[in-house]
Amino acid sequence: STTKGEQLKSFMPSDAKFTYEIVKELSTPNSFDEALTKHNDIEYLFHTASPLTFDTEDPENVILQPAIKGTENILHAAADHCPNLKRVVLTSSDAAIYSNTDETNPTLSFNEGSWNNTSYQDALKDNITAYYASKAFAEKLAWEFVLMQKPVFGLVVVNPSWVFGPKAYDFDPKRFNSSNEMIDDLLKLNHENNSTFENVSGGYISATDIAKIQVYAIESDDLVNKRLLMTNGYFTCQQILDIINKHFPELNLP
């Protein structure tokens, strides 16, 4: 949005080489064509845009299709309009590697060839399943695009686990991304109601570490055609609650 673009611009030095373009709907056909035609001299492209909310009654059109079509649209636009492009860095997720059901399996093992094989029909059952599956569908599409279309650019995929960390700018507290949405939901817990996320656990990664690997992905030729699973450790929601209670005991969370 213009508001977000101007907000980011305000953080930059006056002589910074920063501009922004607005892509209103990721899933609209040719949604990135105008922006990439205007900036067809770029050499590196980061695709980090994907729905990050579990608060919807329409997972297909809010979560699945924007993730899949957004990836398809930006890759086609990049191949068609950016002849000097050297590399695309796609931010996927560990959710592309295993399903939300698999993640709760204590004996789970995986490697760079592992995939979340949730079917499209099963992905429509609930928002969390849809989110996990959307990452797999979008990433598989990206690898298939590179294999079949053989574009001039190389592809690197970053697969972070749950991302926690400070935001670089002020934001609407009614529109959290999924990681912050979980923490906000836990903050509203009392001893009588439940949280959508209270049984969630998984790997986590610092937002600043994700930023570092994004840069490394364009600097290192060794990472082309690689999937990079990113994690700092493992968390449970109870650990988050324990940290909150330690620093804010007046909240008296369960």
Locate each region found by the language model.
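Active-site Tyr-X1-5-Lys
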Residues: N117-V156
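Glycine/proline-rich active-site loop of Rossmann-fold NAD(P)-dependent oxidoreductases
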Residues: P151-V152, G165-E181, A217-R227
